[in-house]
Swiss-Prot record:
Identification of the protein by name: Cytochrome b
Lineage: superkingdom: Eukaryota
Note: Heme 1 (or BL or b562) is low-potential and absorbs at about 562 nm, and heme 2 (or BH or b566) is high-potential and absorbs at about 566 nm.
Segments traversing the membrane: 33-53, 77-98, 113-133, 178-198, 226-246, 288-308, 320-340, 347-367
Binding annotation for heme b b562: 83, 182
UniProt-annotated binding residues for a ubiquinone: 201
Cofactor: heme b
Gene Ontology biological process terms, A to Z: mitochondrial electron transport, ubiquinol to cytochrome c
CDD domains: cytochrome_b_C, Cytochrome_b_N
Lineage of source species: Eukaryota, Metazoa, Chordata, Craniata, Vertebrata
Subunit and interaction comment: The cytochrome bc1 complex contains 11 subunits: 3 respiratory subunits (MT-CYB, CYC1 and UQCRFS1), 2 core proteins (UQCRC1 and UQCRC2) and 6 low-molecular weight proteins (UQCRH/QCR6, UQCRB/QCR7, UQCRQ/QCR8, UQCR10/QCR9, UQCR11/QCR10 and a cleavage product of UQCRFS1). This cytochrome bc1 complex then forms a dimer.
Membrane topology: Multi-pass membrane protein
Organism: Pseudoryx nghetinhensis
Subcellular location, record wording: Mitochondrion inner membrane
Pfam families: Cytochrom_B_C, Cytochrome_B
């Protein structure tokens, strides 16, 4: 009798992806985030499903339905907070995963990388629409501000915004369609993640050295299954600490006030994981320019393979590039801080400098440093 692992069509796919997959022997904990993202996605889909059972996507009852979930549904408060804070964990893992890809030159797997960028955009869109659903003040005004940005598109902008709204302002139609999109997108993300994995398994994983590891492979199971389980436990620990002790730490108090179109909150700001992009958007005084900078701040990732000038793939043996990478990290943290601050002196100029630094580092300084390092290799 042939082994089911090698004969059954479905089991064979699972086996080749998670059990007998040849993996480099030296991949570090930075390679854990892929599996953690998968866990986050499954967790978000499950908690989201149970929330959708009790949620109503109507402007009159949306806010009350969230209150009902938290007060009356068995463990509803827990499901709601796991979903809200699960989104934060999702983005922490996402940014770590992308940062790992940048540091170790994983972007040279072009298909995998580009699908990853599409995934990033899709997850961001999903999170934005999810934030609108509780229909609090920040939900309503966040939706108004961000959808309004599309009106900066020449000629079709205004029509496009009204088409997305389903009216002349963010209202009942907007909330209903956002709920529909928020429900469907995670399944699209799941399909994209499978394609992401498919392309990755065509080439095999990268490793910290950036050198081919074909000569030194080990089976994924048990070595990396146990490692992923450890990562999952740590993720669960971090998430449950947030959920059970400080569930509202990362949220906005304004969202506990029902949406009121007649009363604008003093500081409109998105969730923390969008603040860096929001800071870049605000740092340009022109509406269209700001929108372009906002989109380019993420889209610039697709240029990474073209901007790679080094003879080495990874930054492991490139100390100058490492310095710039960590400056970029600090710059993104600075932008995140600025995005949460009011638009006044000195925050405006700090935000503008941080935004310029962001694009300068990626487009000019890092490629130039790579070329200098190439010349140093000749010594």
């Amino acid at each position: 009798m042939t082994n089911i692992x090698x004969s059954h069509p479905l089991v064979k796919i699972m086996n080749n992806a998670f059990i007998d997959l040849p993996a480099p022997s030296n991949i570090s904990s930075w390679w854990n985030f892929g599996s953690l993202l998968g866990i986050c996605l499954i967790l978000q889909i499950l908690t989201g499903l149970f929330l959708a059972m009790h949620y109503t996507s109507d402007t009159m009852t949306a806010f009350s339905s969230i209150t009902h979930i938290c007060r009356d549904v068995n463990y509803g408060w827990m499901i709601r907070y796991i979903h809200a804070n699960g989104a934060s964990m999702f983005f922490i893992c996402l940014y770590m995963h992308v940062g790992r890809g940048l540091y170790y030159g994983s972007y040279t797997f072009m298909e995998t990388w580009n699908i990853g960028v599409i995934l990033l955009f899709t997850v961001m869109a999903t999170a934005f629409m999810g934030y609108v659903l509780p229909w609090g003040q920040m939900s309503f005004w966040g939706a108004t501000v961000i959808t309004n940005l599309l009106s900066a598109i020449p000629y079709i902008g205004t029509n496009l915004v009204e088409w997305i709204w389903g009216g002349f302002s963010v209202d009942k139609a907007t909330l209903t369609r956002f709920f529909a999109f928020h429900f469907i997108l995670p399944f699209i993300i799941m399909a994209l993640a499978m394609i992401h994995l498919l392309f990755l398994h065509e080439t095999g994983s990268n490793n910290p050295t950036g050198i081919s590891s074909d000569a030194d492979k080990i089976p994924f199971h048990p070595y990396y299954t146990i490692k992923d389980i450890l990562g999952a436990l740590l993720l669960t620990l971090a998430l449950m600490l947030l959920v059970l002790f400080t569930p509202d730490l990362l949220g906005d108090p304004d969202n506990y006030t029902p949406a009121n179109p007649l009363n604008t909150p003093p500081h409109i700001k998105p969730e923390w994981y969008f603040l860096f992009a929001y800071a870049i958007l605000r740092s340009i005084p022109n509406k269209l320019g700001g929108v372009l900078a906002l989109v380019l701040s993420i889209l610039i990732l697709t240029l990474m393979p073209l901007l790679h000038m080094s003879k080495q793939r990874s930054m492991m043996f490139r100390p100058f590039s490492q310095c710039l990478f960590w400056i970029l990290t600090a710059d993104l943290l600075t932008l995140t801080w600025i995005g949460g601050q009011p638009v006044e002196h000195p925050y405006i100029i700090i935000g503008q400098l941080a935004s310029i630094t962001y694009f300068l580092l990626i487009l000019v300084l890092m490629p130039m440093t790579s070329m200098i390092e190439n010349n140093l290799l000749k010594w």
